[in-house]
Amino acid sequence: MSPHKDFQSSSTPVPVCMENDPNCDLLRYLIALAIFIGLIAIFMFGCKAAMRLLTRKRNRDTTQSDTDVIYPRDDPRASRSHQNFGFMDPPPRYEQIFKRGGGTPSVITTREAPSVTRSTGDGSLPPSYEQAALNARRESRPQLPQGTLREVPLTAIDMEHPAMSTPSSTVLDMESEITNITNHAQACVHRYDASHANEVTRTAVAVTTESPAPAQSTSNALPELEAPEGGPPGYDTISLHNETVSTR
């Protein structure tokens, strides 16, 4: 082979993609797709590594539940200001208030501690629950004698009216009262109904004719209207009947 031919074969130009060549467009699409898949794989690998680190850190640290946040445990590293928002002692737990062995709960009531006092140790710090209870009991004993204390439950309050004679009269019989009101309303409707207007007129005429003269009357009292025979009882009769029933 001649050197001229070797130089000619080695200097052959590399084919360049043309603008409208479909093979070049397919090659570019495959390269872009490979780069996109690689980026997604790198992102997922990074997320998985971060999750592993968070899981290891969570397992190392002590887990705190909602109860531990409200009632923090006795941790020597925790300061007093973080336990109960500035108070010395945290609020009592359920097992501290209601112990399994029974007995009175170790809580401060309004009767035992009418006022919160400072502890005898450090005046700048608020007292503990036990110290406040002890101070309140010591102060309440000499001031309030035991004989003057009287606990009255709500169910034992005397609700009797002073004018009532017996405690049974304080209880209202609602059924009988409702029945009396209903009967009275029905009697009024039946008495002053349009169909009984003639009876009312006849009663009024009879009263006016039988009433004495105004000069002979000794008082200004109005004459009583009497109900017709066979009709319903009057208002006064019903009222007297209700009064007698209520007094019984």
Curated annotation (Swiss-Prot):
UniProt region (Disordered), positions on chain: 59-91, 208-248
GO CC terms: membrane
The keyword Membrane appears for this protein: yes
Record's compositionally biased regions (Polar residues): 210-220, 239-248
Membrane topology field: Single-pass membrane protein
Subcellular localization, as worded in the UniProt entry: Membrane
Coiled-coil residue spans: none
Keywords: Membrane, Transmembrane, Transmembrane helix
Chain segments annotated as transmembrane: 30-50
Name used for this protein in its record: Uncharacterized protein M01A8.1
Source lineage: Eukaryota, Metazoa, Ecdysozoa, Nematoda, Chromadorea
